[in-house]
Every structure is written in structure tokens, then in C-alpha cells.
Amino acid sequence: MALKNKVQLITYPDSLGGNLKTLNDVLEKYFSDVFGGVHILPPFPSSGDRGFAPITYSEIEPKFGTWYDIKKMAENFDILLDLMVNHVSRRSIYFQDFLKKGRKSEYADMFITLDKLWKDGKPVKGDIEKMFLRRTLPYSTFKIEETGEEEKVWTTFGKTDPSEQIDLDVNSHLVREFLLEVFKTFSNFGVKIVRLDAVGYVIKKIGTSCFFVEPEIYEFLDWAKGQAASYGIELLLEVHSQFEVQYKLAERGFLIYDFILPFTVLYTLINKSNEMLYHYLKNRPINQFTMLDCHDGIPVKPDLDGLIDTKKAKEVVDICVQRGANLSLIYGDKYKSEDGFDVHQINCTYYSALNCDDDAYLAARAIQFFTPGIPQVYYVGLLAGVNDFEAVKKTKEGREINRHNYGLKEIEESVQKNVVQRLLKLIRFRNEYEAFNGEFFIEDCRKDEIRLTWKKDDKRCSLFIDLKTYKTTIDYINENGEEVKYLV
């Protein structure tokens, strides 16, 4: 299935107007000619993590709408939805049955009880110390209702104890049947792309980091890709890992996220030097989705491990913190840098990270749109939103700094901002200009400049950025064969 080589929007189901119907109205009113696709962050009933602890996929959270709202949107846009392939909610019917009946539950094999890893079911500290942890311990303890016995079950994620997010055993035939049902549901309502969220964590194996365990993970990924394809669905893998892992996935034909680009662009604009960006652009896989911002923070570790000196990385992090950002940190000393650098993600809006400088922000988007891949723009970034400190204070969740919900009046006002109008014009150019379906060139220039070019047949467009001033221009050949200069 051919995906549209056009910019996509990323949004929560309730962040642009309050629900899916209003989201569709907003898209039709303001952005009908702007986006080729829409990534709707989890609209399913969920018990936590703003949708990422799914109770069921068979229905949409009623306050957001119904599956038919998704189907209507799919008439005009490539729809992308998340499949939390690593876990489900502890309030799902499957885990609720397990909580009641324990090992006698017909769904017991869907979950990872500790005896699947350690024969006696007792965790070994030395093994856990080798793991790439997302919480202090990778399991939670639950009491079984009918027996009163305690069961320890694997829970990679979750900020509560016990966790709301219960890991699935992807080697279980029950889990594979469950995933097939999800693909079928998605296909029935017009979903074209499925993002496998947290897929790097699905294989648990003692003696490893329990993150992207090779070669076992490839068996699962190949199975998932084949099954999704049978329903006309493309898979997009969400894997935060070292650069080498991204290359391995790309070589196996998987669509992946370019999680390295956001920090690289930020570094380039803050330091007014193209060196890191040029080195990266010459060595990255092509079949990627590009982004600068998303519902999580700007990736740092482990995505940039080996690509940047931690001292230089810390300088950029410190500037972002001065501009209002907060940080998500790495758990486990083994996965921190030797000098103790432990920043996992920088939580802030991309516009705020660039000090709300319109020209710098448009330069960043121009770099993103000229980088090979399908670009995605997060809804806060679309409206050049600033850090939402009130949301952080209210929720005690650092990532809420970049998850502001916009009402209709606020959307109308934001769309009229000069920086947003300039961004919309740039998005339209990226979508419509034919050369972006051609060949990409990185042009030699001074270190304080950027020159990137796309060519196809008689069409050519060249991006020039003066990093000293952030002035951004695009020279292109129009339909009459004339050279036009476009000041972004």
C-alpha cells in the first residue's frame, strides 16, 4: 500500500476541539489541504497514561466519539493509530479475569508471570540490574481474589504501584489471536498505518537488557508485519534505541521513526553549525517518518548514544531547561553515560525550545520537511504552542508541558498567528512540489549555512538557511519553468 508522501498531523482525540467529531470539523475548516494523514493518539478506553493503558480496542472512548468518527476521517486522510503491543490495562477483561482466578483464568497465559523467566518465580537482582528499566522494578505484585495468593506479573511501564500497564506475552498464541483481532478492527474502520508502541520491550529474556532482544524480536516483527499486510495495514515501529538498531530495522524493510533528527536540528540551530546535521543526513536510513515534536519529549538517550559527546548534549539540555523544559531521566546506572549523563527526553514544546523565535522555528521545520521521509507535525507545534506550566503543576506530569488542549476559539486565534500562517504555507509547498518524490542532495557550503536540494525531471527545489540569522529561503522551478525565490 502506497502512503501519501505528505505531511501528517499528530494529535490526541480531544486536543483540537474536545472530541473526534470536532477534530474532523477543525481539519475540514482549517487544514483540509494541509495534511495527507492524521495520527490520532490512543482514542480507546484507558486506565492511565493518557490513552496508553488500553482497556479495549473494540470501541472508542465514548467521550471522544465512536469508530465511525474515525471511519469518516479516513475518507480524506491516511489514519494512523497506536497498538500498545507491549501491554494492556489492568482493567482489561483479560487481566480482570486473571486477578479473579489466577492461573485458572483462561487468559492467564497472556501475561508474564515471573516463573516464565525464573524457574522458581523468584527474581534475581543481578539479572534485573542488566535490564533497561523504565521503573524501579519491572514487575508488580497482585493479590488473586479467589485464592488470596500473590502473583508477580511483568510491568515494564507505569507510574503507579501496582502498575496500570500489564505486559503481554507476545509468544502466547492467545496474545497473537488478540493482536489479529485488533488488526481486523483497525482495517474495518479504514486505518492505514499502525504504530507499534513500545515494541522494543516485547521480548523478555534473562541475561539481556530485555530491550530489543535479538534475534527473537525479529520473529515477532516479521509475524506482525505479515499479518498487518494481510489487512492492508502498514506498520510503523516506535523504538527508542541506538542508531545501529534503526539501521537494522530499516534494512529489514520496516518503517521507523527518525528519533535522532529532533535533537540534531535543535543542536544545529542553537550552535549555528551544520556539522552534526550534515554528518547525520549522509548516514541515515531513508524509509523513516520524521518529527520534531510529539506527545513525549525530545529524545536524547539512548537514541543519540555514540552520535554526540555528552558534554555537548548537556549544553543543549541546559539551554532548554533555562527556557522552561523539564527532563525525563534514565533508570539504572548501567544505561547512564560514564560521566553520569542520564537525560532520556527533554519535555517542552519545540517552539519554546527555540526561545519562541519564529525564524528559528520555521528553519527547523524547513530542515525537517527537506529531510527524506514522511514528515509529522504535532498539534502543539502546528499552532506554535508554548510550554504549558499550569498543566504540569496541575497533573504533576512533566510531559503535560507539551499536551495543551485547544478549544475552538483558541484554535481560531492560533491559526491566525503569523508564524502559523508561514508554517502552513511551508507544509503546502512540501506536499505539492513534485521534486520531493525525486532525488535528495546535500550541498557543500559553509558551516554556518545549510543547503539541501530535491530534484525530479525538470523540477528542482533548494533550501538555503543562514544559521547566523535563521533566514530561510527556497529556490524552486515553477510550472512555467521559471526560477522562483520563496522566503519562508
Swiss-Prot record:
Temperature dependence (free text): Optimum temperature is 55 degrees Celsius.
Sites where the protein binds sucrose 6(F)-phosphate: 49, 87, 195-197, 238, 295-296, 342-345, 399
InterPro entries tied to this protein: Glyco_hydro_13_cat_dom (IPR006047), Glycoside_hydrolase_SF (IPR017853), O16G_dom_2 (IPR045857), Sucrose_GGa_phosphorylase-rel (IPR016377), Sucrose_phospho (IPR022527)
Superkingdom to which the source organism belongs: Bacteria
A GO BP annotation: carbohydrate metabolic process
Enzyme Commission designation: 2.4.1.329
Gene3D superfamilies: Glycosidases (3.20.20.80), Oligo-1,6-glucosidase, Domain 2 (3.90.400.10)
GO MF annotation terms: 1,4-alpha-oligoglucan phosphorylase activity; hexosyltransferase activity
Site (Transition state stabilizer): 296
Reactions performed catalytically: sucrose 6(F)-phosphate + phosphate = beta-D-fructose 6-phosphate + alpha-D-glucose 1-phosphate
Keyword Transferase part of the UniProt annotation: yes
Record keywords, A-Z: Carbohydrate metabolism, Glycosyltransferase, Transferase
Active site: 197, 238
pH dependence text: Optimum pH is 6 and 6.5 for the synthetic and phosphorolytic reaction, respectively. Thermostable. Has a half-life of 60 hours at 60 degrees Celsius.
Keyword Membrane included in the entry's annotation: no
Outcome after substituting residue 134 to A: Shows a decreased ratio of activity on phosphorylated fructose over fructose. Displays increased transglycosylation activity on a broad range of bulky acceptors
A Pfam family per the record: Alpha-amylase
General function of this protein: Catalyzes the reversible phosphorolysis of sucrose 6(F)-phosphate into alpha-D-glucose 1-phosphate (Glc1P) and D-fructose 6-phosphate. May be involved in a new pathway for the degradation of sucrose, which could become phosphorylated on its fructose moiety during uptake via a PTS system. To a lesser extent, can also reversibly act on sucrose in vitro. Is also able to catalyze transglycosylation reactions in vitro.
Quaternary structure and partners: Monomer.
Family: Belongs to the glycosyl hydrolase 13 family. Sucrose phosphorylase subfamily.
The protein, known as: Sucrose 6(F)-phosphate phosphorylase
Organism of this sequence: Thermoanaerobacterium thermosaccharolyticum (strain ATCC 7956 / DSM 571 / NCIMB 9385 / NCA 3814 / NCTC 13789 / WDCM 00135 / 2032) (Clostridium thermosaccharolyticum)
Gene: spp
